[in-house]
A protein has these predicted regions:
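Sec-dependent bacterial lipoprotein signal peptides
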Residues: 1-19
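C-terminal/domain-edge helix-coil "capping" segments
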Residues: 19-36, 130-198
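A structural "domain/chain start" motif
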Residues: 19-73, 100, 192-198
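Envelope-exposed proteins and targeting segments
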Residues: 40-42, 66, 73, 84-88, ...
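Solvent-exposed loop/turn segments at secondary-structure junctions
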Residues: 51-52, 94-97, 161-162
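Structured segments of extracytoplasmic/periplasmic soluble domains
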Residues: 65-76, 95, 182-190
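Acidic helix-start/capping segments at beta-turn-to-alpha-helix junctions
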Residues: 78-99, 198
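Surface-exposed short loop/turn segments
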Residues: 91-150
Length: 198
């Protein structure tokens, strides 16, 4: 009976794993000033970068994910309507695309052989019937932490990943959390280094 229960559990986990879409790593690049003492302390506000719609649901989801990470780093969230000493300028870019096929959908092969009883030539044709590549969604998240009074950039980071359009992570809520965690993991990070976060 115990074996049957374990087998059923294993089958359930396998089925669940099949429902989770594969996700590539998040590419993260960060830059910061040499003096880091002002980072990770005091009040901070998340604000839309120029050209961003700060009232959209997408922006608010990403802003909330960024704010959570900043609080975990030691910042406090500035009350609405107050001018915090630092602010995080947030930019979001999303685009849909289809990857180019690396090869032709039709392939032709020719083979020949010679033996004691004669020779022969064979011709083979292969057709790729898998259809076009699935649509992908790329999301790029950019955050710049600035000193409000001087406008000086103290820290800047960019995180990006691409997933299938049908993946749950193509949706804003899940994608925002994943990108924000990757962007601020190991904060402030090595300046100028690009890393892959799985």
């Amino acid at each position: 009976m115990k074996c049957l229960h374990l087998a059923a559990t294993a089958l359930g986990l396998a089925a669940l794993a099949g429902c989770v879409a594969p996700v590539g790593p998040v590419e993260v690049t960060r830059f910061h000033v040499p003096e880091l003492s002002s980072l990770g302390r005091g009040a901070i506000a998340v604000e839309p970068a120029a050209g961003q719609d700060g009232q959209s649901l997408e922006y608010r989801s990403y802003a909330a994910a960024i704010a959570r990470q900043l609080v975990l780093l030691g910042y406090s969230e500035a009350p609405a309507g107050t001018a915090s000493p630092q602010f995080a300028s947030l930019r979001i870019e999303r685009r849909s695309f289809r990857a180019d096929r690396p090869r032709s959908p039709v392939s032709v092969g020719v083979g020949g052989s010679t033996g004691s009883y004669g020779s022969g030539v064979g011709l083979g044709i292969g057709l790729d019937l898998s259809g076009p590549p699935p649509e992908q969604v790329e999301t790029v998240l950019g955050v710049t932490i600035k000193h409000r009074a001087s406008g000086k950039a103290l820290w800047e980071g960019k995180a990006s990943f691409a997933v299938r359009a049908a993946s749950p992570l193509a949706q804003t809520q899940l994608g925002a959390a994943k990108l924000a965690e990757a962007l601020f993991g190991g904060f402030p990070g090595a300046s100028g280094e690009t890393i892959q976060v799985k």
